[in-house]
Swiss-Prot record:
This protein binds RuBisCO small and large subunits and is implicated in the assembly of the enzyme oligomer. GO terms for cellular component: chloroplast. Oligomer of probably six alpha and six beta subunits. It is found in: Plastid, Chloroplast. Belongs to the chaperonin (HSP60) family. GO terms for molecular function: ATP binding. This is RuBisCO large subunit-binding protein subunit alpha, chloroplastic. It comes from Pseudotsuga menziesii. The keyword Chaperone applies. The keyword Ribonucleoprotein does not apply. This protein shows ATPase activity. Keywords: ATP-binding, Chaperone, Chloroplast, Nucleotide-binding, Plastid.
Length: 17
């Protein structure tokens, strides 16, 4: 995932997995 901004989208994507 791309979350260079640290906006939490990566965390959401991981939880969605």
């Amino acid at each position: 995932t791309n979350d260079s901004a640290g906006d939490g989208t990566t965390t959401a994507s991981v939880l969605a997995r």
